[in-house]
Each structure stands twice: as structure tokens, then as C-alpha cells.
Regions:
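Mature catalytic domains of secreted/periplasmic carbohydrate-active enzymes
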Residues: 1-148
């Protein structure tokens, strides 16, 4: 198991085999075989009281980004700027609580998972396999879930 990780922003394919590719505030358009990371934040990189008026990223947006990143073999580093006293503001706390509730319910779809190596590969894409699932969504989040 790795005890340290080295990151690099501008790496060719060969370098990505030894150094973890860091895609700042972005993501590749397809699954990448080597692990990679993207970093983003709820608002600004540093604490800024304007975000209380301007707003932060929503929990739904962060969750969608997390699922997209993980499905492409990536890691999401989420920066949550702290006030000078080391605490979160109320809006940040509410967003983190909502993300936490989603992960408590759906964490098994994120933690310890591995992407399919070929898009569309797997039991659902194979002929003759019946799918038994119920799906639902809420208009406010646009996040789909399926019954086990």
C-alpha cells in the first residue's frame, strides 16, 4: 500500500505511470487507467465572506462531480475554506452535512470501487440478462438512485 503520493499537473502518458496526474478543477472525458486526482473547492480557495452572499457549490453538484470522478478512476480533493478561527461557516456545514448524508446512504457506490475498463462493459450491457431495479429521482437534486 502506498504511503506517499507524488502529484504533477502537466504529465505525459508515460509519466502518469509513476506520478499521479492532478487535474485542477477539471476531469478527463473518459476513464483513465492510472489513478488521477482533481481538486476543487466549495467556493474560493481561501475563506471569503462574499461566498455567504454569492453562494457555494451545492451538495448535489459536489456529489455529481464525485460520482463522475470516481467512475473515471479518479479521486476528488474537496477544499473547504475555514474561517480564521479554524471553523466552517453555517452554509459550508450544511453542504458538508448533506454530502455526508448522501455518502452514508450511497457510500458503497463510491468507497473501494473500481471503474469498468471498457465503457458499456458489464452484466447490464450483456444480452439475455434481466434487470430488476426500481429507480427514483427528486427534481431538486436530479440524483438517481436504484433499489438493491
Amino acid at each position: 500500500k502506498a504511503t506517499a503520493v507524488m502529484f504533477g499537473k502537466i504529465l505525459d502518458e508515460q509519466q502518469r505511470k509513476a506520478i499521479t496526474w492532478d487535474v485542477e478543477r477539471g476531469a478527463p472525458s473518459k476513464m483513465i487507467e492510472q489513478p488521477w486526482q482533481t481538486c476543487t473547492c466549495l467556493g474560493d480557495w481561501h475563506y471569503n465572506t462574499r461566498n455567504l452572499r454569492k453562494g457555494y457549490k451545492s451538495a448535489a453538484l459536489v456529489v455529481r462531480q464525485l460520482v463522475d470522478v470516481v467512475s473515471k478512476n479518479g479521486n476528488l480533493l474537496l477544499s473547504v475554506p475555514l474561517r480564521a478561527d479554524g471553523t466552517f461557516d453555517e452554509k459550508e456545514k450544511a453542504i458538508l452535512d448533506e454530502i455526508g448524508r448522501w455518502l452514508k446512504t450511497n457510500g458503497e457506490s463510491v468507497y473501494g470501487t473500481r471503474p469498468w475498463l471498457v465503457f458499456g462493459e458489464g452484466p447490464i450491457a450483456e444480452k439475455g440478462i434481466a434487470l430488476n431495479a426500481q429507480a427514483s429521482t427528486t427534481r431538486s437534486t436530479g440524483i438517481w438512485t436504484a433499489a438493491k
